[in-house]
């Protein structure tokens, strides 16, 4: 028997980058988790739109529905250290703050306790979809996937790969072990029951600095062999990181686009975090390869060494997919609302720096990036991101008032 839910009231969602639709008295029909009816006025609803005795939710004053937020870049093991190390250069921040925290996830009991709180916190913030970096520990990564699955959060979960240029206590023993554990995590995630496909694996090289040639090549082979497998990494995050990458890979002359492409890691399912310092050539390559960008404005303006404002307007002008990321850890907030605010502030700064060429983001555009734009980056735009009929009902029910306030 079909399960039917009806929502009546205020609905807000993006139709495209520039169009944010506010509907005062919408009717949404959800059948077995999918949107099967959407009308903008009560008068438009057919008499036979839903079966009798359907469960109807009439939204009260101060309540509305929005699509669930999509977090395109999130370090789950860094959730306990949000806000620490602000102002440090990126490689110093990793060594002094991040690696010691992530090393604790070698303990599965600790990992389970932290990840339960982490996932619950992001769900409480309305983040119904997240692309998670795990730690380098396979067991902890499986635990994270299990928790996302149990809590009903749509997630991409990846075991972080790092077999060099990290302290011994966190560095993986070899590329072979890293690759084998990654394959085992992929099998585990794809075998979660019941099979609702909410949780998916993602190949996760930390960045080229921490990966040997053998490891990058092996991960690229996985991505090339499976056209459903997503890849995420950091890309042109900060000048210190770019300089270190160029020193390790001099043959690519500073182009991370050429570097990652040479290993088979760039395609339409690639999620590239940050992208703050970009040449026109690299923008052209990402556009041609249809990669997605995870814009992390909070982290980019507080960690890494410098005032790093990604050229989001130029990305959008070129048709490059862009979503927002909390970058939990580097980003001090779990809230996508905070990320939206910071994205708008950063874009205002970018407009000044570009002498008006790169116009600041509007509220409509920032909201799009946090929902439908993020869905595009994760190649989920046909499933979630707005309330189009046929999509899955992935939403946040927002209440802005209390009983006291309504009296």
For every predicted segment, state its role:
Residues 139, 143-276, 281-283:
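Metal-coordinating catalytic core of metallo-dependent amide/deamination hydrolases
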Residues 10, 28, 33, 62, ...:
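Divalent metal-coordination and catalytic microenvironments
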Residues 82-153, 178-195:
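Alpha-helical scaffold segments that flank or form the walls of functional sites
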Residues 128-129, 229, 321:
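Short acidic/polar active-site loop segments enriched in Thr and Asp
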Residues 80-113, 164-175, 238-269, 292, ...:
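Active-site gating loops and adjacent loop-to-helix segments of metal-dependent hydrolytic enzymes
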Residues 1-52:
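N-terminal metal-binding scaffold of metallo-dependent hydrolase/deaminase domains
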Residues 262-266, 311-404:
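His/Asp/Glu-enriched, well-ordered alpha-helical/loop segment
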């Amino acid at each position: 028997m079909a399960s039917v839910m009806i929502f009546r009231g205020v609905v807000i969602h993006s139709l495209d980058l520039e169009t944010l639709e506010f509907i005062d008295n919408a009717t949404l029909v959800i059948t077995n988790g999918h949107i099967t009816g959407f009308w903008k006025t009560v008068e438009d609803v057919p008499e036979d739109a839903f079966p009798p005795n359907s469960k109807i939710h009439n939204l009260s004053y101060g309540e509305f529905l929005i699509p669930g937020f999509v977090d395109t870049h999130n370090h789950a093991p860094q959730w306990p250290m949000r806000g620490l190390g602000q102002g440090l250069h990126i490689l110093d921040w990793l060594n002094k703050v991040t690696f010691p925290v992530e090393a604790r996830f070698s303990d599965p009991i600790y990992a389970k306790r932290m990840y339960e709180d982490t996932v619950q916190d992001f769900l409480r913030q309305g983040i119904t979809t997240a692309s998670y970096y795990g730690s380098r520990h396979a067991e902890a990564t499986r635990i994270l996937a299990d928790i996302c699955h149990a809590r009903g959060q749509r997630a991409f979960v990846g075991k972080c790969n790092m077999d060099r240029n990290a302290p011994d206590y966190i560095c993986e023993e070899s590329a072979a072990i890293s690759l084998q554990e990654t394959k085992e995590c992929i099998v585990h995630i794809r075998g979660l029951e019941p099979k609702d496909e909410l949780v998916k694996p993602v190949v996760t090289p930390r960045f080229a600095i921490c990966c040997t040639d053998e490891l990058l090549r092996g991960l690229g082979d996985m991505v090339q062999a499976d056209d459903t497998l997503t890849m995420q990494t950091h890309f042109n995050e900060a000048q210190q990181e770019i300089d270190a990458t160029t020193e390790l890979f001099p043959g690519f002359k500073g182009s991370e686009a050429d570097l990652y492409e040479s290993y088979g890691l760039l395609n339409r399912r690639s999620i590239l975090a940050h992208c703050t310092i970009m040449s026109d050539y690299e923008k052209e390559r990402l556009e041609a390869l249809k990669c997605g960008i995870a814009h992390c404005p909070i982290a980019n303006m507080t960690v890494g060494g410098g005032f790093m404002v990604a050229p989001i307007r130029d990305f959008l002008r070129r048709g490059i997919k862009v979503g927002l990321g909390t970058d939990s850890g580097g980003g001090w907030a779990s809230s996508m609302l905070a990320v939206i605010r910071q994205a708008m502030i950063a874009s205002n700064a970018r407009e000044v720096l570009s002498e008006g060429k790169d116009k600041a983001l509007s509220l409509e555009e920032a909201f799009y990036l946090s929902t439908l734009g993020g869905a595009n980056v994760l190649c989920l735009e046909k499933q979630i991101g707005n309330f189009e009929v046929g999509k899955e009902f992935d939403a946040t029910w927002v209440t802005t008032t209390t009983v006291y306030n309504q009296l």
